[in-house]
Amino acid sequence: MLQLWKVVRPARQLELHRLILLLIGFSLVSMGFLAYYVSTSPKAKEPLPLPLGDCSSSGAAGPGPARPPVPPRPQRPPETTRTEPVVLVFVESAYSQLGQEIVAILESSRFRYSTELAPGRGDMPTLTDHTHGRYVLVIYENLLKYVNLDAWSRELLDRYCVEYGVGIIGFFRAREHSLLSAQLKGFPLFLHSNLGLRDYQVNPSAPLLHLTRPSRLEPGPLPGDDWTIFQSNHSTYEPVLIASHRPAELSMPGPVLRRARLPTVVQDLGLHDGIQRVLFGHGLSFWLHKLVFVDAVAYLTGKRLCLDLDRYILVDIDDIFVGKEGTRMKVADVEALLTTQNKLRTLVPNFTFNLGFSGKFYHTGTEEEDAGDDMLLKHRREFWWFPHMWSHMQPHLFHNRSVLADQMRLNKQFALEHGIPTDLGYAVAPHHSGVYPIHSQLYEAWKSVWGIQVTSTEEYPHLRPARYRRGFIHNGIMVLPRQTCGLFTHTIFYNEYPGGSRELDRSIRGGELFLTVLLNPISVFMTHLSNYGNDRLGLYTFESLVRFLQCWTRLRLQTLPPVPLAQKYFELFPQERSPLWQNPCDDKRHKDIWSKEKTCDRLPKFLIVGPQKTGTTAIHFFLSLHPAVTSSFPSPSTFEEIQFFNGPNYHKGIDWYMDFFPVPSNASTDFLFEKSATYFDSEVVPRRGAALLPRAKIITVLINPADRAYSWYQHQRAHGDPIALNYTFYQVISASSQAPLLLRSLQNRCLVPGYYSTHLQRWLTYYPSGQLLIMDGQELRVNPAASMEIIQKFLGITPFLNYTRTLRFDEDKGFWCQGLEGGKTRCLGRSKGRRYPDMDMESRLFLTDFFRNHNLELSKLLSRLGQPAPLWLREELQHSSVG
């Protein structure tokens, strides 16, 4: 029996162990199923957030008896014909927060400005050009820097402001060591600092109010404890924003703290010293100060720098039918969408949600979500619709236009089968792929399949900062800047909003979203399907935003369909019609949505920019002899030169441009370049060139501008120009402003490229001097080997080519050519090195006098750049001084 127990006991222990392991395994599997269920099941909805209510519900009337409105005092406008519409901003440093906030608002409003470090003794910048004022408004980041100017600078600035009707905006930021109470030096105005305030209100009597709507009292504390309020008995000061002290301040001494009305912003009407000012007792971190600041700029500039009251908003809902289960819209969500749209139409005329669809994903949600899809289609006539891609694929991944067009046709067929109206002429690419950087196949397919006239993107010229986003037109399609609103595919629950729900509310109530509408006349907002299911944050956001805007501003909100909206945009900003192409490889986001079949290695490393008739073709020829240097392919339409940056070719895009260059075998050692001699004197080329090729080297060749003018005239005669054939050179260069148009056109092409200093200054505005090589064309003609040595060193080309052995002077041609075996040479075409009669003395004397000042400015410029003046320039200046 004992032996049997010894055998059975281990067996029973083994079964017990197995049972325990089985229970543990079952528990783990159960927990796994539970975790999967919890993660994939829809979350239990908390009560949906309610949008902002009517203005009338936001607090009671302000403290004290209401003041009757005061008739606005007459405003002295700036001398509009005598001042430039430019704001002069004095900042504490290039990195000060308030200074950056001031500049950001000016940039967002598209106002021109100039920043200067707040001057020390005698450092006031030049304020006038002869009798013309340079600035229409002066802003001081630190008011005390203005108040404490030395007597000479203060008198200079104040006299300028009085004479030209220029106003001043100043900010007073209290510090820890600031006096709690003090009189502002030289003004009948007292400051009380380092206060905690609450319950703010706009004074309806303030004359500067334009965008700002006078409000009822808004209860609640103002951020921070470093506020400054203003007190004065002088009639020149009118409160703009008013607050009251916090209860904790009641026990503090001083009669001002027991007053109910404490101005944080005051308007100086100019009755004290003839200068109008607006003074802020805090920075711009408080949202209402930003709003009043915009009004102050408008008022003090006589509305020369003023934002119109009209605002156009379009709300796109991307990814209709797209989205994983549990995040899509259901029937109740669609009903809420319709209800909110109708409510918004009472506040924003013609407001309509704009729905972008990808038909492939129709009915791919849960049963409830599929019913939501059907509900959207049932009410399809209530919305506007635009196409995404059929399968939500990014267009830049399609390298074949026909395949891309086939995807679009699938989406179009889906729309036809379900009765979706698609006649808006608008489309949006998933992830904005192919819109910018340009994917030409997308634009062509859009036009052929859908007849698209308008699209939008957040990527031009870059995503951040948003205030720099702009529109452009390419291939007949208008591209509008698209704005984000803080809602993305993953932001679907109010209490899980990144940074907390207060972050979303802060954006709506005076933050980024509010400022987007305030500072942009046209806003196209990107939202997503998932923002209208779940907690319906899209509905909450835009209803709250519209109501808040109507509470605090006088903006006239309205909606237009995409095509008239785009037409309106380019009426307002015609200068944006032409794009500014940039290097896609300089922006990671751009590179991610750019075809992998394209490479920035095909962009040139240097440009030969001219001017014409100075020897640039010879340099092009000599450089092409170098094994590490490769020129662009010749253009069949523009005299072999590409002429991309200065003409209609620019609008064909960078794909067209790069097709003129081979893919280098070694991008680090191979040098691609192009020569277009018309670039030098073009007003647009330096900016365009620097945008696309910011690191490119620039080579220019200068000869005596009189000789260049004569050479161009002879060039035109050789090509049969009837004006050059029928007029002498002297008649051309001395023609009056009343001369025939074609004669004056030839005159300009002879003379204007010779304004060397003017054109070089333009290039130096966009390129650092270290990237610009100014060659002596006369030296190039006499000693090309030495000139080519300079160029090779400038470019950093290896291996170094000895042009003394490579080039040979051709006696018959009268020019330097490539030396070949057997004493032969290979030279430029017969049109180069052409001989013609010497210039007549009358023309020579005329041009010497005509170019005297231009040559003098060139000499000064070369001296500043540390470059020696060429021999021809020294000779010209000597002759001019002798004459």
From Swiss-Prot:
Residues 598-883 are annotated as: Heparan sulfate N-sulfotransferase 2. Glycans are attached at residues 233, 350, 400, 666, 726, 802. It is a single-pass type II membrane protein. Residues 41-597 are annotated as: Heparan sulfate N-deacetylase 2. Keywords: Disulfide bond, Glycoprotein, Golgi apparatus, Hydrolase, Membrane, Multifunctional enzyme, Signal-anchor, Transferase, Transmembrane, Transmembrane helix. Residues 40-883 are lumenal. GO terms for biological process: glycosaminoglycan biosynthetic process; heparan sulfate proteoglycan biosynthetic process; heparin proteoglycan biosynthetic process; mast cell mediated immunity; regulation of angiotensin levels in blood. GO terms for molecular function: deacetylase activity; heparan sulfate N-deacetylase activity; heparan sulfate N-sulfotransferase activity; N-acetylglucosamine deacetylase activity; sulfotransferase activity. It comes from the Eukaryota. GO terms for cellular component: Golgi apparatus; Golgi membrane. It is found in: Golgi apparatus membrane. Its main location: Golgi. Widely expressed in adult and throughout development. SUPFAM superfamilies: P-loop containing nucleoside triphosphate hydrolases (SSF52540). Its EC number is 2.8.2.8, 3.-.-.-, 2.8.2.-. Residues 65-77 have a biased composition (Pro residues). 3'-phosphoadenylyl sulfate binds at residues 613-617, 711, 832-836. Residues 1-18 are cytoplasmic. The chain crosses the membrane at residues 19-39. Pathway: Glycan metabolism; heparan sulfate biosynthesis; Glycan metabolism; heparin biosynthesis. InterPro entries: Heparan_SO4_deacetylase_dom, HSNSD_N, NST/OST, P-loop_NTPase, Sulfotransferase_dom. Disulfide bonds join 817-827. Monomer. Essential bifunctional enzyme that catalyzes both the N-deacetylation and the N-sulfation of glucosamine (GlcNAc) of the glycosaminoglycan in heparan sulfate. Modifies the GlcNAc-GlcA disaccharide repeating sugar backbone to make N-sulfated heparosan, a prerequisite substrate for later modifications in heparin biosynthesis. Plays a role in determining the extent and pattern of sulfation of heparan sulfate. Required for the exosomal release of SDCBP, CD63 and syndecan. The presence of 4 different heparan sulfate N-deacetylase/N-sulfotransferase enzymes in mammals, as well as differences in their enzyme activity suggest that some initiate heparan sulfate modification/sulfation reactions, whereas other later on fill in or extend already modified heparan sulfate sequences. This is Bifunctional heparan sulfate N-deacetylase/N-sulfotransferase 2.
